[in-house]
């Protein structure tokens, strides 16, 4: 059995690393948190009362609105989010060292070899480091997601949860919304702005060719990680 040349072994290792990196990049760029499945709420069947005109149970309120208030009701969240962040960091470090050792003497006379003070020594060092970092990010989100009321708290607030999954030509787009809504903030058309959602968890991203083109490769991620020596 012939052995591989010494030069081909590093090339083979690099090729295997590239293939593994391609396999990793083929997965989801940014996985989403798994939401609990929305279980439909079955309303209890009211037992008819003999001899009564009105029966207990859910009915249509002629003088009320159709805002979400109970578990299982639907509510539309209008996404109006805009964030801007920037950060700048500069670091500069320098250090200099100098040490001189005088030549020893014997009976007041220096020890020399051929007229030179061979035992005289001096050392010096100079180290410096400079680093600079700049980050800027701006995000804007507009749209709407219809969510489901998952729980009604004792104070009347509603725990909501929902997501929207769009299957596009070049991939998938997913929007997830979770949070707590105050019943008084729900508009008459059964909508609420995302700025009124407490403990809001809004996730937006995608899977597919478009999302892959916006992600760094495995080698770039290595040089930007803590494992990079540079």
Curated annotation (Swiss-Prot):
A Pfam family annotated for this UniProt entry: FlgH
UniProt keyword annotation of Mitochondrion present: no
Gene Ontology process terms (BP): bacterial-type flagellum-dependent cell motility
NCBIfam families: PRK00249.1-4 (NF001304)
Known partners and oligomeric status: The basal body constitutes a major portion of the flagellar organelle and consists of four rings (L,P,S, and M) mounted on a central rod.
Coiled-coil features, chain-numbered ranges: none
Organism (species): Xanthomonas axonopodis pv. citri (strain 306)
A GO MF label: cytoskeletal motor activity
PANTHER family: FLAGELLAR L-RING PROTEIN (PTHR34933:SF1)
Signal peptide start and end residues: 1-15
Disulfide bond residue pairs: none
Cellular component GO terms, alphabetical: bacterial-type flagellum basal body, distal rod, L ring; cell outer membrane
Protein name (Swiss-Prot/TrEMBL): Flagellar L-ring protein
Topological category with respect to the lipid bilayer: Lipid-anchor
Lipid moiety-binding region (S-diacylglycerol cysteine): 16
Protein's cellular compartments: Cell outer membrane; Bacterial flagellum basal body
Family classification: Belongs to the FlgH family.
Keyword Signal in annotation: yes
Keywords carried by this UniProt record: Bacterial flagellum, Cell outer membrane, Lipoprotein, Membrane, Palmitate, Signal
Lipid-acceptor residues (N-palmitoyl cysteine): 16
Gene: flgH
Protein task: Assembles around the rod to form the L-ring and probably protects the motor/basal body from shearing forces during rotation.
Top-level division of the source organism's lineage: Bacteria
């Amino acid at each position: 059995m012939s052995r591989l040349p010494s030069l081909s072994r590093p090339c083979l290792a690099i090729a295997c690393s590239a293939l593994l990196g391609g396999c990793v990049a083929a997965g989801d760029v940014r996985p989403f948190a798994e939401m609990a499945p929305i279980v439909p709420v079955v309303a209890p069947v009211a037992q008819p009362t003999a001899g009564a005109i009105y029966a207990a149970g859910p009915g249509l309120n002629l003088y009320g609105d159709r805002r979400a208030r109970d578990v299982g009701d639907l509510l539309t969240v209008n996404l109006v989010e805009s964030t801007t962040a920037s950060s700048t960091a500069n670091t500069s470090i320098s250090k200099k060292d100098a040490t001189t050792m005088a030549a020893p003497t014997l009976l007041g006379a220096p020890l020399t070899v051929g007229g030179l003070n061979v035992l005289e020594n001096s050392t010096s060092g100079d180290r410096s480091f400079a680093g600079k970092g700049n980050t800027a990010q701006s995000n804007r989100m507009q749209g709407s997601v219809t969510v489901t009321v998952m729980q009604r708290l004792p104070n009347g607030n509603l725990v909501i949860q929902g997501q929207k999954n769009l299957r596009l030509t070049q991939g998938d787009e997913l929007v997830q919304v979770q949070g707590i809504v105050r019943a008084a903030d729900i508009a008459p058309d059964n909508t609420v702005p995302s700025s009124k959602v407490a403990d809001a968890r809004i996730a937006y991203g995608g899977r597919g060719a478009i999302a892959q083109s916006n992600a760094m490769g495995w080698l770039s991620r290595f040089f930007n990680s803590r494992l990079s020596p540079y």
